[in-house]
């Protein structure tokens, strides 16, 4: 691949990768920050979108229009929902859904935006590359499954229980991925979501998030950097 885009919501989620760019250039527009340069010989643009679905969609649209990448990797932190998952574990998306959209009365699935797919499937090649990179990162525990998105931080037990009931197979919840996936779907751009867990949903999530965001950001960045290197070698 000639050009890879990486998207994270917060500075903590993108700065490690951005600091490794050669010939780094930074620009800001409409609330989004773009870092461009080369990583392991691959042309890369890194977007810090801001938190939440609207910020993610706006930033991703700007990114796709201005830079026209061959693929998008969404990285950063998430809250874990899988019973066997722990802080620092990495989740690769098998599919991505909204968990806070309700148009069921019109015949849509819960979580489905009208006239859009109920779930967004990541690019199989990008998922395979992510799997291959796991072998070289022995210290990371990695799972693959459903990642759900909503404009809510999962610290409330009632919200956590409701999400578990509606999406029993969900491994991770966060606040941007489905908006990024939906935008990529509309533009026909391949994507994958790679998230490291900063907290386990419902278990003092607000406290553990602050304590472990750096660990989660480091683990997700390690995975993404390994993917960029492998994708560059294969191109």
From Swiss-Prot:
A single cellular component GO annotation: cytosol
Matches recorded under InterPro entries: MTA_SAH_Nsdase (IPR010049), Nucleoside_phosphorylase_d (IPR000845), Nucleoside_phosphorylase_sf (IPR035994)
Any single GO molecular-function term of the entry would be: methylthioadenosine nucleosidase activity
A Pfam entry, by short name: PNP_UDP_1
- Give me the residues that bind substrate, please: 79, 154, 175-176
Alphabetically ordered keywords of this record: Amino-acid biosynthesis, Hydrolase, Methionine biosynthesis
A single GO BP term for this record reads:
L-methionine salvage from S-adenosylmethionine
Q: What is its EC number?
A: 3.2.2.9
The reaction(s) annotated as catalysed by this protein in its Swiss-Prot or TrEMBL entry are: S-adenosyl-L-homocysteine + H2O = S-(5-deoxy-D-ribos-5-yl)-L-homocysteine + adenine; S-methyl-5'-thioadenosine + H2O = 5-(methylsulfanyl)-D-ribose + adenine; 5'-deoxyadenosine + H2O = 5-deoxy-D-ribose + adenine
Catalytic machinery residues:
13 (proton acceptor), 199 (proton donor)
Query: Pathway membership of this protein?
Result: Amino-acid biosynthesis; L-methionine biosynthesis via salvage pathway; S-methyl-5-thio-alpha-D-ribose 1-phosphate from S-methyl-5'-thioadenosine (hydrolase route): step 1/2
Protein family according to the UniProt entry? Belongs to the PNP/UDP phosphorylase family. MtnN subfamily.
Per its UniProt record, what PANTHER family does this chain match?
5'-METHYLTHIOADENOSINE/S-ADENOSYLHOMOCYSTEINE NUCLEOSIDASE, 5'-METHYLTHIOADENOSINE_S-ADENOSYLHOMOCYSTEINE NUCLEOSIDASE
- Functional note: Catalyzes the irreversible cleavage of the glycosidic bond in both 5'-methylthioadenosine (MTA) and S-adenosylhomocysteine (SAH/AdoHcy) to adenine and the corresponding thioribose, 5'-methylthioribose and S-ribosylhomocysteine, respectively. Also cleaves 5'-deoxyadenosine, a toxic by-product of radical S-adenosylmethionine (SAM) enzymes, into 5-deoxyribose and adenine.
Which NCBIfam families does the record associate with it?
A: MTA_SAH-Nsdase, PRK05584.1
**Protein name, entry field:** 5'-methylthioadenosine/S-adenosylhomocysteine nucleosidase
UniProt gene name = mtnN
């Amino acid at each position: 691949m000639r050009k890879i885009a990486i998207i994270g919501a917060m500075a903590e989620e993108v700065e490690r990768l951005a600091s490794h760019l050669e010939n780094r250039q930074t620009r800001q527009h409409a609330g989004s920050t773009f870092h461009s340069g080369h990583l392991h010989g691959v042309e890369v643009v890194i977007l810090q979108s801001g938190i939440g679905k609207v910020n993610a969609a706006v930033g991703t649209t700007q990114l796709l229009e201005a830079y026209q990448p061959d693929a998008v990797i969404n990285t950063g932190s998430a809250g874990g929902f899988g019973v066997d998952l722990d802080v620092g574990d990495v989740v690769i998306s098998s599919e991505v859904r909204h968990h806070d959209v309700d148009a069921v009365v019109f015949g849509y699935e819960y979580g489905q935006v009208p006239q859009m797919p109920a779930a967004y499937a990541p690019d199989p090649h990008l998922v395979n590359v992510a799997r291959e990179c796991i072998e070289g990162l022995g210290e990371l525990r990695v799972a693959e499954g459903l990642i759900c998105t909503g404009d809510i931080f999962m610290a409330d037990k009632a919200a956590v229980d409701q999400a578990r009931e509606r999406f029993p197979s969900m491994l991770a919840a966060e606040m941007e991925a489905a908006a990024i996936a939906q935008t990529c779907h509309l533009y026909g751009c391949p994507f994958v979501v790679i998230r490291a867990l900063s907290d386990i949903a419902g278990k003092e999530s607000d406290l553990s998030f602050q304590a472990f965001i750096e660990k989660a950001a480091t683990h997700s960045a390690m995975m993404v950097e390994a993917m960029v290197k492998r994708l560059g070698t294969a191109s």
